[in-house]
């Protein structure tokens, strides 16, 4: 097997075309081996195998610089740069390899940590400018595809690459897909270019000042080598547009490209997946609820940004929603400004977004939404410790971010019933933008009545009255708060338990009511505590006699963390919290 022996891409240059085709086949099988056992991005990587072999054959990496957008296509690159053991080896060897570009893992060949979309061209222009100033001669190659061209930063990067006017190669990996179907006018032009074999008159890339090459056979190693050779050492901004097949070589991924964009472990022989217990999910509950409400309210519009799965909108549900579902492509900034405009125009927009991606929208939320006080709704999902754990995808920063923006209410429901009650109120009210942090610790139900109306000022809910100690447990950490209260009761301490519901500001009345009867307040939040919910409460009590123990995650860039270890390191295991409470009281 070639790939077991290849330690660097330079070894590919000794092989003939037939051997390179074997390398491509072996690489595809290695990728399949990893994702079938470990999970990961399936379709995007399988479709870019031949292109990766050709890129490393033609160009002289690591002198020549490769930048992969979003890293969804970087697995074959890892196989060919000395990391095949992470695809062929045991579980520990697989765990050692990130699912994304990682200079920590391989500084020689991975130039950047990349996991969010539309950044490759911008990053590459920085390398381009550095090369030009230093007077060196290396090729700079950015790889972009899988819907990333719908993101605003991709446009900004292309604009700058054209402005610089020196050699840069942008490989547009056109597999006709994003995560789901692509959205945006650029994809109409890509379709026209495909259908005309790159010859149509209205060429978006040429209009921006790029040299342009088109290759229909984007999964043909020999033809890829030919087109890459033709642009090597160019001194002009150049686009190489290759038409590939997402999931190439694995029929289940070809037949259902959206479902196989990313996959958990599966049987690589037939694509079957292990049966898992059927459990409720907020994605399914939300999409069903929205579709039902849409039938009664034609002004209700569900918005997604390239990830319709965040709101549970399968292809069938997107079809059912029709014009009442809008996917803006991988363009979160556009989503925020658009929902503000929708609300201004009399619609009731609900945008659902993964916590890790809302980080891209700070300015739009502050400027376009909150200053204008337009009553749009933002669902923030997968926020917290129990979500994604790669360094580029950690979901710990939405609370400090959103709570720093004036004019935005950020709600944290603790149960399914409370969530949908908050959602209904947020949709029907017409005064302010409302964000809601969907619980990330599973779907919990309550038989108790939940409020149907919510104030625009924070109003906490005391769910159990006690003394000496008050536990204020927000959102998906509320059940942790219940556990802590129970454990304290076993030690003779009857604690007060509070569901704060509001993350963006403190409820002064409730906090003042604790003075005199309580010595300690413990705050629990499922995210970064620096600048978060608990620190606001600590600041409020600053001049009082009440002590505050702020429970949350220390600010850091965590990578592939173990959940229980992360909680333990931050003194957030139930027993640790109880120990700390007793120590402080004593």
Regions inferred by a protein language model and the residue ranges of each:
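Peripheral docking tails and interdomain loops at the edges
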Residues: 265, 273-278, 387-389, 409, ...
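Non-catalytic terminal/interface segments that mediate subunit docking, oligomerization
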Residues: 64, 250-359, 364-374, 473-475
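Glycine/charged-rich beta-loop-alpha catalytic/anionic-binding loops adjacent to active sites
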Residues: 29-36, 96-113, 135-141, 314-328, ...
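Cofactor-/ligand-binding subdomain signature composed of acidic, glycine-rich
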Residues: 1-34, 252-268
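Acidic, glycine-rich active-site loops and adjacent beta-strand->loop/helix elements
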Residues: 70-75, 144-151, 172-178, 218-219, ...
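Glycine-rich ThDP/TPP pyrophosphate-binding loop and its adjacent helix/strand module
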Residues: 110-267, 272-279, 283-288, 408-518
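Cofactor-binding active-site loop characterized by glycine-rich and histidine/acidic residues
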Residues: 41-164, 300, 305, 314-315
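A glycine-rich helix N-cap at a beta->alpha junction
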Residues: 87-97, 163-177, 370-382
């Amino acid at each position: 097997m070639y790939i077991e022996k290849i330690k660097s891409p330079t070894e590919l240059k000794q092989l003939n075309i037939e051997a390179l085709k074997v390398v491509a086949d072996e690489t595809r099988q290695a990728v399949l081996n990893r994702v079938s056992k470990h999970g990961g991005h399936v379709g995007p990587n399988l479709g870019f195998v031949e292109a990766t072999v050709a890129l490393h054959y033609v160009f002289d990496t690591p002198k020549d610089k490769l930048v992969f957008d979003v890293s969804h296509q970087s697995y074959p690159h890892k196989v060919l740069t000395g990391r095949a053991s992470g695809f062929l080896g045991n579980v520990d060897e697989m765990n050692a390899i990130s699912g994304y570009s990682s200079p920590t893992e391989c500084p020689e060949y991975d130039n950047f940590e990349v996991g969010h979309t539309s950044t490759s061209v911008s990053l590459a222009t920085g390398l381009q400018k550095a090369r030009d100033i230093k007077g060196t001669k290396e090729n700079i190659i950015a790889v972009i595809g899988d819907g990333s061209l719908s993101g605003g930063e991709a446009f900004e990067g292309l604009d700058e690459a054209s402005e610089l006017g020196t050699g840069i190669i942008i490989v547009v990996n056109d597999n006709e897909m994003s995560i789901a179907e692509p959205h945006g006018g650029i994809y109409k032009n890509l379709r026209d270019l495909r259908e005309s074999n790159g010859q149509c008159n209205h060429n978006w890339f040429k209009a921006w000042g790029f040299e342009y090459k088109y290759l229909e056979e984007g999964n043909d190693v020999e033809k890829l080598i030919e087109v890459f050779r033709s642009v090597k050492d160019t001194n002009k901004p150049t686009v190489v547009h290759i038409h590939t097949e997402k999931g190439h070589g694995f029929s289940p991924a070809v037949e259902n490209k959206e479902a196989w964009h990313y996959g958990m472990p599966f049987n690589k022989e037939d694509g079957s997946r292990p049966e898992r217990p059927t459990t409720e999910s907020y994605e399914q509950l939300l999409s069903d609820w929205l579709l039902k409400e849409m039938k009664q309210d034609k002004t209700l519009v569900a918005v997604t940004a390239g990830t319709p799965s965040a709101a549970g909108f399968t292809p069938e549900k997107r079809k059912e929603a029709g014009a009442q579902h809008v996917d803006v492509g991988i363009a979160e900034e556009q989503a925020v400004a658009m929902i503000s405009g929708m609300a201004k125009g009399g619609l009731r927009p609900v945008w659902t977004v993964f916590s890790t991606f809302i980080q891209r929208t700070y300015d739009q939320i502050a400027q376009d939404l909150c200053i204008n006080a337009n009553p749009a709704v933002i669902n923030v999902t997968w926020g917290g410790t129990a979500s994604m754990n790669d360094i580029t995808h950690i979901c710990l920063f939405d609370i400090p971010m959103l709570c720093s923006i004036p004019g935005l209410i950020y709600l944290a429901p603790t149960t399914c019933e409370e969530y949908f009650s908050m959602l209904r109120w947020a949709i029907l009210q017409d005064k302010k933008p409302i964000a809601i942090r969907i619980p990330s610790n599973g779907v919990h139900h309550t038989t108790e009545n939940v409020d149907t109306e919510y104030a625009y000022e924070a109003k906490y809910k005391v769910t159990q009255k006690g003394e000496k100690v008050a536990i204020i447990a927000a959102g998906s950490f509320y059940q942790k708060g219940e556990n802590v209260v129970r454990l304290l009761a076993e030690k003779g301490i009857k604690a007060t338990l509070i569901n704060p519901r509001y993350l963006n500001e403190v409820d002064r009345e409730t906090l003042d009511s604790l003075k005199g009867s309580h010595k300690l307040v413990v705050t629990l939040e499922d995210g970064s505590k620096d600048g978060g919910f608990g620190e606001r409460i600590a600041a409020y009590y600053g001049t009082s006699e009440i002590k505050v123990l702020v429970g949350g995650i220390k600010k850091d860039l965590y990578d592939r963390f173990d959940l229980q270890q992360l909680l333990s390191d931050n003194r957030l295991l139930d027993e640790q919290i109880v120990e700390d409470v007793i120590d402080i009281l004593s």
